[in-house]
UniProtKB/Swiss-Prot annotation:
Disruption phenotype: Leads to poor ubiquitination of CIT2 and accumulation of citrate in the cells.
GO molecular function, one term: protein-macromolecule adaptor activity
Protein name: F-box protein UCC1
A biological process from GO: SCF-dependent proteasomal ubiquitin-dependent protein catabolic process
Keywords per UniProt: Ubl conjugation, Ubl conjugation pathway
Length: 369
């Protein structure tokens, strides 16, 4: 330990905790003491928000542990700094449970923000695209004017908008585009967002000229704007409700077969602000066959199971969603380095590709303070 480290360690605990609020990522990397203290501070935040005896923990415990465990290729050695934990079990206290007690920073973020949503039907379209060979202009009269491409859930904290304040949350949709010709259909795929079995739904969609920006095959992330405010938070004050099931439905209004023959495949959604300083419209990633590096099936399963349980518990109406169909699918989560090619809202803004290459993997969990 050098002199500066020694001087830092001589400061009182209150100062250490205060410093963690300002520079958490930098300070927790200093030594084991600050890593453990950082973990403890997020345990306190989590349990101050959702008490240990709240039913929410029983709802999420199993799938949350599986999600955190799936991140071990990224952080197993760091997680194992926190010792004296036990394998997850029904009778194991929360604060002793492996993958929770050693990972409160990730747990806090997983509960504070809506998780990624994957379209579980994406692979059947991409696998059948060569055999189908259907013409997007054929059988016009027999095609429905509107079809649901996917419908899914993720959990949203009740106080989400009051906490975010001036930090709007984006809604991003992911597509596989087989060729530039089919990109013209993207603006006709709209997304209906609302709380499951509660209140009105709102619509978000891509810019009408988005097809002009897509010039080749690839996986594209398209910005649909911001998550709309869906309810008055005051309605839930004093009810003990901490989360609500957020429902997203993708609706195909293309009057074509491009979304079912593999030419244009909706992969899923996320709510991550990939670049805050420059408003962006879309980005393309390399290589094309990289969906398992974008969507962690364990994360998507946790988000869905959490929201599905909330919908069942909170609604008097019948829930049309099945139990989790995500768990057990997909490859183990191994985020590889993917390069993003951004298209910005303001054409004069350009991307620094050197910085993009130098940045750490962007497709690891997005963790806020």
């Amino acid at each position: 330990m050098n002199q500066s480290d020694s001087s830092l360690m001589d400061l009182p605990l209150e100062i250490h905790l205060s410093l963690l609020e300002y520079v958490p990522n930098e300070l927790r990397a200093v030594n084991k003491y600050f890593y453990v203290l950082h973990n403890h501070s997020y345990k306190e935040k989590s349990l101050a928000w959702i008490a240990e005896d709240n039913y929410i923990w029983a709802v999420v415990k199993h799938s949350l542990c599986l999600y955190v465990k799936s991140l071990d290729p990224l952080r197993q050695h760091a997680r194992e700094i926190i010792q004296e934990t036990k394998e997850p079990g029904f009778n194991v206290p929360l604060c002793m449970t492996k993958y929770i007690a050693d990972s409160w920073y990730i747990v806090y973020n997983a509960l504070q923000y809506p998780g990624k949503i994957i379209n579980m039907g994406w692979d059947k379209y991409t696998k059948s695209q060569d055999s189908n060979g259907s013409d997007s202009t054929s059988n016009f009269n027999s095609r429905p004017k509107e079809r649901t491409l996917m419908q899914s859930l993720t959990a949203l904290p009740v106080n989400f908008w009051s906490r975010r304040k001036d930090e709007p949350t984006p809604v991003n949709v992911w597509f596989y585009v087989k060729n530039a010709h089919v990109a013209r259909y993207i603006p006709k795929i709209i997304t209906e967002i609302g709380i499951c079995n509660y209140g009105p739904k709102q619509i978000v969609a891509s810019a009408g000229y988005i097809n002009e920006l897509i010039t080749s095959e690839g996986i594209y992330c398209v910005n649909l704007g911001h998550l709309p405010r869906l309810y008055d938070e005051q309605i839930f004050e004093g009810t003990g409700t901490t989360h609500l099931p957020l429902e997203l439905k993708a609706i195909d209004r293309t009057d074509s077969d491009v979304c079912i023959n593999g030419d244009l495949v909706l992969l899923g959604y996320d709510f991550i602000p990939y670049q805050i300083s420059k408003p962006w419209l879309l980005f393309r990633i390399e290589p094309v066959n990289s969906i398992e590096a974008i969507f962690n099936y364990s994360e998507c399963s946790f988000s869905y199971q959490f929201a599905w349980s909330l919908a069942c518990l909170q609604s008097e109406e019948k829930i049309s969603f099945p139990r989790d169909t995500i768990i057990g699918h997909g490859l183990p989560y191994k985020p590889s380095k993917l390069i993003r090619i951004f298209v910005y809202k303001h054409p004069e803004q350009k991307q620094d590709l050197g910085q993009e290459i130098a940045l750490p993997n962007w497709n690891t969990p997005y963790l806020r303070r």
